[in-house]
Amino acid sequence: IYLPVIMGNGSEVYERCRELDCPPFTLVAIGGLDWNRELSPWECDGTIRDAEPFGGQAAGFLDELLKQIIPQAESSLPQPPAWRGVAGYSLAGLFALWALWQTDVFERVASASGSLWFPGFIDYARERTMTATPDVAYLSLGKKETKTPNRMMRHVLDDTRAMEELFIERDIPDRKSVV
């Protein structure tokens, strides 16, 4: 599982998965990212006045992930992985989902409290075909996210439910939503 992280090294995520008795997996945590620039699919204003804008450089990070990070990580494994997943929290959750429309290398995806409020993303997803349909998809959204006064972000619940419906329409065989 490839996991962009804003802080830490992903060990908390891995340990939590072990506590939940998840089957064994390899976790590749990717840090050092300029979150708003490298995980946003296109440019847009920040979420509040005078906030850092979103840079729209996700394609560049995805290219680095596909051409450098994945080959390097998987070359150290004793055998090729049985499946490959991409996961993320917040803006990285948006990136994980967006990646499904860009490449067919991920069979599984998880978006935890994904920034599905991102302007134009749900329409983008509806209007295009995924490069490959994942075998497993997970969506979650915390209760606090739905109560934000921020105009840009306040429809995140509707957008997460819209993505859930899109997964149903696209016949993703194993999907789980905690919304």
Residue ranges and their predicted role:
Residues 1-64, 68-76:
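Serine-hydrolase catalytic machinery in alpha/beta-hydrolase-like enzymes
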Residues 32, 110-118, 142-145:
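Active-site nucleophile loop of the alpha/beta-hydrolase fold
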Residues 83-88, 112:
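Short beta-strand immediately N-terminal to the catalytic nucleophile in serine-hydrolase-like folds
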Residues 87-92, 96:
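Gly/Ala-rich beta-loop-alpha elbow adjacent to hydrolase catalytic centers
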Residues 98-108:
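Conserved hydrolase catalytic core segment
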Residues 134-146:
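Catalytic His-Asp charge-relay segment
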Residues 143-174:
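Active-site-adjacent alpha-helix of alpha/beta-hydrolase-fold enzymes
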Residues 178:
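Conserved small/polar residues in nucleotide/adenosyl-binding loops
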